[in-house]
Amino acid sequence: MRLIPPINQLKQWILAWQLRGQQQLARWGIREQTLLIGLSFIVGLVAGGATWLFEQTVKLIENYYYLPLANSTHATTRWPCYVFLPLIPAGGGLALVLWRRLWGRQKSELHGLAGLLHSLSRESGKLKASLGIETLVASSLTIGSGGSAGPEAPIAVIGASIGALCGNTLGFSRRNMPILLGCGAAAGISAVFGAPIAGVLFAMEVLLRDFSVRTLTPIVISSVMASTMYVGLSGGGAARGIFQMPTNGPALAFTFGQVPYYLLLGAVCGLLAVGFTRFYLLVENYSQKHRSRIPYFLHPAIGAALSGVCGVAMLIIFRDDPFLHTRFAQGYIPIFSDGYPTILRMIDPRWYSGVHTIAGHTINLTLEFLVVICVLKILATSFTLAPGGSGGVFAPALFIGAAGGGAVGLVLAHYGLVSDPATYALVGMGAVLAAAIQAPLTAIILLFELTQNYAIMVPIMLAAVTATVIQQLLVGESLYTLPLKKLGVKLGAAVGISALQRIGVDQLVLLKAQVARPDDSLSSILARSHLDGEEDFVVMDKTGNYLGLLTIDDLKTVLLEPEAAPLLLVGEVMRADVPPIKFHDTLDAALTMFGRFDISRLAVLDDVNPADKTPALLGFLTRSELMKRYQQELAGDLTV
């Protein structure tokens, strides 16, 4: 008797447990949709706890690695010692590489939220639960060592992996797995900002692109639970997150005469988002292009070192500023890490009015300071993340928007057109975010929840929509979808596309496929087609490797010249350009292939065989079967 390997035996036990559990729930009359509601509470609570753990891990690395090294080497206080500053984030980059190698995972072409979007759009939410642990440590190393990145995207990925773990454990169907991932992602964003509604909209507008009631309910529950859990663990009072608004926020008052100014602000923020996106893409393309010349595992460290050079530039430019000199002595560089403390100063009116003084010097945020940190933040973030660092662009986008908006506010205030530049910094913060991630609704509601003031709505709506349109016209994609576009993956919107993304080929009825060999004559294929009524054939070699398709259109062409059929071989006329579809691919991927190659059938291959075996041919997927299943799913969504 052959012994079953322990790992396979464990998988069999888990599968058997799932099947027994599903059967028992069915006996009790508990549907998976009902179970999803209950599970959303658990996902939200665990994601809220994971957010707190992530925050503490970042602080731990910052307090026991970055600050001791910065202070002991005088890297932020003395000119000759500035050269040591880039080495500190570079060390974090090397630690990141070692962690990934230890974990057995290398940076793929799609990571972070781009990887999560790909999983949702092409794999029905298929996500490894271990990705959460890998992301927690990797992003903590990047941000805690001074890398310019935000915690929001990592926390969203961690939350999604928690949802994936729960769904996989209970054997959830592909229909509901994306919703669980959305629950986790919404929970993470909610906990970061203490903004449950923004978390819900982020998951539905950016990730799922699905606003159906069936999707909304569990995501709302997870978002609220995560915010509640984080507040409980952090000891906060009201619903506050990692990012907390200043107690003296800008005086929000809107008049019709300010419309042109906010449209101008939106245009500036849109151009900033375009510049940020294009430079990020430039660095990423350069890194990928030079993989062979520079060992790829060194790229995160080199990028982190370059972000450190940006910090050195800031030290040199502002070393005579009394306030910044004090902050530099504490090891703080405004463009490093998430930049939250600097964002809070930029949206606080007191930092524009000369209320603060240090050693007899009045402290004001100047136009020079805002412009410089805006440019340096774009550079530092691109150098940190594009070569392989782990983190998000959410916080950098807020930082860039606050700096750009504050600069616009100062210029307008100089000419007596406005009285409070901090308001423009606040609105600019949301406008750049809306443009960079192409999610204006999320940005609008996020600012409303942060300020808890309805007066912000019209200004941010004007600026966010203007900025988003400019980004759409000049770039056409967000920072999250650009990597997908490079791989030929297009994301749709609304319920229809969502339905295609959550249904797998494995849920459809396949037709039996007839196999032809490349050395078969076309006359023999025509005879088989006439005898059996077959229209399409899968062309495979003798070892079972897929080579292409022979379609009815190819046969019709031969029928016009039947005397040539005995002289032609299948391999000479087959469609070698048509790839097969995998058994666990989504209908979205299948529909894309149907449209791209203009065919009515696709060969379906098994994708669960060991790597050393040839994938088995399972049958044909027809376009008509796909559309029939799609209409059924769409009708179900609209009636929920």
Language-model segments: what does each one mean?
Residues M1-R502, D506-Q507, L511-K512, A516-R528, ...:
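Alpha-helical transmembrane segments and immediately membrane-proximal extracytoplasmic
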Residues Y480-Q514, L526-H530, Y546-L602, D607-V640:
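Tandem CBS (Bateman) regulatory domains
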